Every structure is written in structure tokens, then in C-alpha cells.
Amino acid sequence: MIVIEQILSKQDVGAYRQQLAECPWGDGRKTAMGMAASVKNNNQADAQHANVRQLANQLLARIGETPKIVSAALPHKIFPPCFNRYNETEEYGYHVDAAIMRIPNTSEVIRSDVSMTVFLSEPEEYDGGELVIATEFGQQQIKLPAGYAVVYPSSSLHKVTAVTRGQRIAAITWMQSMVADVTLRQTLYQLDQSIQNLIKANNTDRAELDNLHNVYHNLIRQFTQL
């Protein structure tokens, strides 16, 4: 589980919220697969609406140009982002994301390796509505500032708790990673982040940094699937 700080600025969030307020919304259960439909109770912006498609494309572009997301997920394919809304009493019970997803209006499918939530509501705007992810270390609760995101393995059992006050708006998407194995992907992320931190510190011999870069990229060559 990795937090991405300010993938969207406050101004971006305001623009997204304004446009989403003018878009049609429907019952989120219509897009749920299998057992997830029975525990899903939220609303989802109409993915076919022109404004929703435009926002989704803008977010796709932002994902691709955010180095920390690229490092953490090593995305090969990205599902078009969806926008969901939880009003008071609405929730999404424990579920696991579908392993295979078909991209709407295409014949293309992706394997969901990495899930991402981008928060579009400030924490003080609503009570409840925490994203809860079951991990080997217990339940992890996430409630981040608007514009922040969290990425986590799609294999994780997770839920969104009931909103008891206000409204929770977020964007969600899924990625097929070039590295399917979650442990290997996390190790590559840690290595890359260590290299980036050494570069920022500016006190490491250039030859050593070149060697580390060489190791990282050769591991990428060895383990990625395209």
C-alpha cells in the first residue's frame, strides 16, 4: 500500500468536483461483478457521458506522468478511471476486485494487479467512508486529503465503510502491471525509491549510482512482461 501525495492539486480537485456535479449518476451496483454486487451501495458517474470521459482521460494522463505511480505500479495497461460517490448510509462491503476486466466499448481486457483510489473529498467533509484494506498485518484504514491517492494490490480484500455524514467522492482505477508478482514489484519500487533518494541527497559517487541504475534496469528487463 503506497500513498501518492497530490496527484491532483486543490484547483484540479475543484474543477473535477464542479464538472462531476453536472454529470448524470447511476446505481453503482450495475457495474459490480459477481458477489461484489450484493455488498455495493453507492453511485457512479455515467462513464459514457462526454464530461466523464474527458475527466477520465485527464486523470489517465496524470497517472502516466506521476513518477511515484509509475515506480510503484509499473503499469502496462490502465482501466479508464471511474468516479464514485457515497452519500449518507452508503457503503461497499468487503470484496475483491475482479481479476480480469474488459475495457468498456473495446475487446481489450486487462488483468487487475494494482488498484488505485484518488480522493476527491476532503476528510472533514464526511464521517465514515474509510477505505479499509485487509493485510497480513491487520486492517489498514485510509482516509486521505483531496487530491491524494493510494495504490494497493488488487488481490487485497477491501471495503469502504458506511458514510455517516456528508458525501465521499473519489476516482478509482485498476492497472495491469508489467510485473505481476506483488512482492517483486514492491522490491523494485523500494530499490527505485532508494536510488531517487540518493540522487536527491547528492552525496553519492556517480559511478555507484550508475551501477545501481544498471542493476535496477536489468532487473526490469528480466522480470517485466509486455
UniProtKB/Swiss-Prot annotation:
Superkingdom to which the source organism belongs: Bacteria
GO molecular function, one term: iron ion binding
The UniProt record lists the keyword Iron: yes
UniProt-annotated binding residues for 2-oxoglutarate: R168
PROSITE patterns (UniProt xref): FE2OG_OXY
HAMAP family per UniProt: Hydroxyl_YbiX
Record's protein name: PKHD-type hydroxylase Sfri_0612
